[in-house]
Design a protein with these regions (language model features):
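Short, small-residue-biased leader/transition segments that mark boundaries at the very start
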Residues: 1-7
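C-terminal helix of von Willebrand factor
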Residues: 8-37
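Soluble, acidic/polar mature domains that operate outside membranes
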Residues: 36-50
Length: 211
């Protein structure tokens, strides 16, 4: 397990060697893998934002010999999927000619309230055999609007959206930077160590350089 840090000022040094130092020293999970299966009756299209260099073949999820990411104490992992609900027009993918994407009633019976199914594998530090956790992604967990979503979700969307815009993502044409900035400000929260304020300053600096 290793970590790469970029230290550009005193505040960053305090973060790396102070508040975040123990997070890199104490591993809590090795070879963490995440897999999501979407219900094709409810989701017609989906895509994972980022993680292009961390993608695994489907069959490698259950293969404990395939390495994956390690997680330290205090770290968290966020995966953002963009989905298109079934029946919504203007998708990016043409309808299938053979083998329609909509599942048969027999296959979907009992899963009408599930957008998908999440599976997570990890190894305890020093062990060779992985452990499996799983849970359905329920319709009842959805929110009618982004503004009604939990603060952590709104923050993650703001950061992910800005990352897409900054790198010139093919799907970022309609992203409004000012709207993302306001979204991040509203989801800033307590911000004990000032990291979120630093992100807001970064948005401001990049926008000034662009203009």
């Amino acid at each position: 397990m290793g970590s790469e840090m970029c230290i550009r000022d005193r505040n960053e040094a305090q973060k790396v060697f102070g508040s975040d130092f123990s997070k890199s020293l104490v591993p809590i999970a090795d070879d963490l893998k995440l897999q999501v299966e979407f219900n094709r009756e409810l989701v017609s299209e989906y895509r994972l934002l980022g993680y292009e260099t961390r993608a695994l073949a489907r069959q490698d999820f259950n293969n404990d010999k395939v390495d994956a990411g390690d997680i330290g104490s205090g770290h968290s992992v966020t995966a953002i999927y963009e989905i298109l609900p079934a029946g919504v027009a203007n998708g990016f993918v043409d309808p299938l000619r053979y083998g329609q994407a909509v599942a048969t009633p027999t296959r979907s019976k009992g899963f009408e309230e599930e957008y998908g199914f999440l599976k997570l594998r990890y190894k305890r530090p020093g062990e060779d055999e992985s452990n499996l956790m799983s849970a359905p992604i329920l319709k009842e967990a959805a929110h009618s609007s982004l503004s009604s979503a939990p603060r952590e979700t709104r923050w993650a969307v703001a950061v992910g959206g800005y990352g897409m815009a900054l790198r010139g993502d093919d799907y970022a044409d309609n992203i409004d930077i000012a709207e993302l900035s306001n979204l991040a400000k509203g989801a800033k929260g307590r911000d004990k160590y000032g990291y979120r304020s630093e992100f807001l300053d970064l948005i401001k600096t990049v926008n000034e350089l662009k203009n």
